[in-house]
Design a protein with these regions (language model features):
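Active-site segments that bind and position negatively charged phosphate/pyrophosphate groups
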Residues: 44-164
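A generic hydrophobic-helix recognition signal that picks specific residues
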Residues: 4, 86-87, 181
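A glycine/threonine-rich phosphate-anchoring loop and its flanking beta-alpha core
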Residues: 1-51
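C-terminal charged capping/lid subdomain of soluble metabolic enzymes
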Residues: 28, 130-222
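Solvent-exposed alpha-helices and their adjacent loops that cap or buttress functional pockets
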Residues: 1-3, 56, 81-83, 175-177
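Structural motif
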Residues: 6-8, 112-113, 182-183
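Short, acidic Gly/Pro/Ser/Thr-rich loop/turn segments
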Residues: 15-17, 97-98, 191-192
Length: 222
C-alpha cells in the first residue's frame, strides 16, 4: 500500500552518488511546483540556473528544500493526501511524460519526460490564450538552461492508423484519474488552473512547435 510517510530524510551527500543526468532529472519537479504554486521560487531557480547547471551544492540544497516544502504543503493542505479526487496539480506536465517513458521503453528518465511534458503544456497554455508568448519563452528557456532537451522523437511516433501515439496518453490519464480528464495548465507563472479538455489539433501544433525549436537548436550557428 501507499501512504504519506511520517517523515522524509534528505541527505544531500547522497547526491554525490548520482550521475549528472540523474542529478539534473530532479530539477524539473522543482520547476513544475514553482510554476503552479510559487512565482518567487521560479525566479530563484532562474537566478540560480547557471549554478544548478554546474551542480553547485548550495544552489542545489536551496532548490531541494523549497521543492520539498511546496510538495509537502500541497499534500498537507489540499484535503486529498491519498489523491482520491480528480484534481492533481502536482501532475502538471505528466500526462505526456508517462506516455513518453512508455514509448521510449524507459530510455527517457522520468524527469526528462516531465520536462518535455511541461514544455508541451506550456505551449498549449500559450496557444489557448492563457499565458503570453513571452512567458512561454521564459519557461522553455529556463528548462534548456538547466540542461533539458525539450523534444524527443517519441512525440512523433504513430500507430497503424497514423495517429500520434502520444495522444493516447490523454485517454490513459483520464482513466488514471477515474473517468474525468483534469489537466493542469498555466494561468501565469506561479498559478496553475484546471482544464477538463485538451483540443487535439492544438496539442499537435504544440508538438510541431517543440520539434521546430529542437531543429533550430541543433543547427550550427553561423
Amino acid at each position: 500500500t501507499f501512504a504519506p510517510p511520517f517523515a522524509v530524510i534528505n541527505d544531500f551527500q547522497l547526491l554525490a552518488s548520482l550521475s549528472p543526468r540523474d542529478k539534473r532529472a530532479g530539477y524539473v519537479e522543482a520547476v513544475k511546483v514553482a510554476l503552479i504554486r510559487d512565482r518567487a521560487f521560479f525566479e530563484t531557480i532562474e537566478r540560480d540556473a547557471e549554478a544548478l547547471r554546474e551542480f553547485e551544492p548550495v544552489a542545489m540544497q536551496r532548490l531541494i528544500f523549497r521543492c520539498a516544502e511546496l510538495h509537502l504543503n500541497h499534500i498537507a493542505t489540499s484535503g486529498d493526501p491519498f489523491e482520491f479526487g480528480s484534481a492533481r496539480p502536482l501532475d502538471f506536465g505528466h500526462w505526456a511524460a508517462h506516455k513518453l517513458e512508455q514509448l521510449s521503453e524507459y530510455r527517457i528518465r522520468h524527469g526528462e519526460a516531465v520536462a518535455i511534458g511541461i514544455a508541451l503544456d506550456v505551449i498549449y497554455s500559450q496557444r489557448a490564450g492563457l499565458i503570453p508568448e513571452a512567458t512561454s519563452a521564459r519557461i522553455l528557456s529556463l528548462l534548456e538552461k538547466l540542461g533539458f532537451e525539450l523534444f524527443s522523437n517519441e512525440l512523433l511516433h504513430v500507430d497503424a492508423q497514423g495517429r500520434l501515439m502520444i495522444l493516447t496518453g490523454l485517454e490513459e490519464f483520464r482513466e488514471h484519474l477515474g473517468g474525468e480528464l483534469t489537466i493542469t495548465l498555466l494561468a501565469e507563472v506561479g498559478r496553475g488552473i484546471e482544464a477538463h479538455e485538451m483540443r487535439v489539433p492544438e496539442v499537435v501544433e504544440a508538438i510541431r512547435e517543440l520539434h521546430q525549436r529542437a531543429l533550430r537548436r541543433s543547427q550550427p550557428s553561423a
